[in-house]
Regions:
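Insoluble glucan recognition modules
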Residues: 1-231
């Protein structure tokens, strides 16, 4: 009698992914942490400004220095014109991009894919008039490069700030963020059933007033953590 037994792969998906490059924070020094997509193990994203001919590497920990060849596929959905330059991921066309890295277990290995999307940051919820069906989220305006700030439209009403990065077709709450002590705090796998104030605490809740705006500095800091304020 043969008894079939299932043996799960011993390999596990990474808990972190970082990017490091010629234009990310301090060049070739800052390892920028990517954010986990809520409920999607092995799925990470980050927003970066990449000027013409910028290059970067990546890793599941700082100083790992993985490159172009370590992706099974690269899907450029943003017109970046991506190539391999000495192992680096090189972008010919400068601009703001969302980098989406997905890891998938394949036997005893992990296949990684990289997708480029046009960067989008948006405001939703009370500050944008509520979650009424048919009310579109309000896009933030990107600066010319990462020396400037992303700026939202004026909030139309007051309430708790709800904002997010649009990553492919993922729902907004999977890629949501707030501000914690002036720094961008990504939701990742935080369990938020109602709102930040109720489920995480008042320090995670940003009160938005009508006429105010959200200002974000993205991809410029040495520690790779973005900053923001409402005023």
């Amino acid at each position: 009698q043969v008894i079939a037994t299932y043996q799960a792969p011993s390999i596990t998906l990474p808990e972190d992914i970082y990017v490091c490059g010629s234009s990310i924070g301090t060049a070739w020094t800052t390892w920028r942490p990517m954010a986990l997509i809520n409920g999607m193990a092995g799925n990470f994203f980050t927003i970066v400004y990449l000027p013409n001919d910028a290059e970067f590497k990546w890793g599941t920990y700082p100083q790992q220095w993985l490159g172009h060849a370590d992706f099974k596929t690269i899907d450029d959905q943003a017109g970046a014109d991506v190539s391999d330059n000495g192992g680096n991921v090189k972008v010919k066309n400068g601009g703001w991009y969302t980098l989406y890295i997905k890891g998938k277990i394949n036997g005893e290995a992990i296949d990684y894919t990289l997708t480029f999307y046009p960067a989008q940051l948006l405001v939703t919820g009370d500050a944008n008039g509520g979650f009424t069906p048919g009310t579109p989220s309000a896009p933030m305006i990107a600066p010319a490069d990462n020396t400037g700030q992303w700026i939202s439209a004026e909030f139309v009403s007051g309430g708790e700030l709800r904002a997010y990065a649009q990553v492919g077709d993922f729902d907004w709450w999977k890629t949501e963020f707030t501000l914690l002590e002036g720094k961008v705090f990504w939701r990742e796998n935080a369990n938020i059933a109602s709102n930040w104030n109720t489920d995480m605490g008042s320090e995670y809740s940003v009160n938005a007033g009508a006429g105010q705006k959200l200002y974000l500095t993205v991809g410029a800091t040495e520690d790779g953590v973005d900053t923001g304020e409402v005023k």
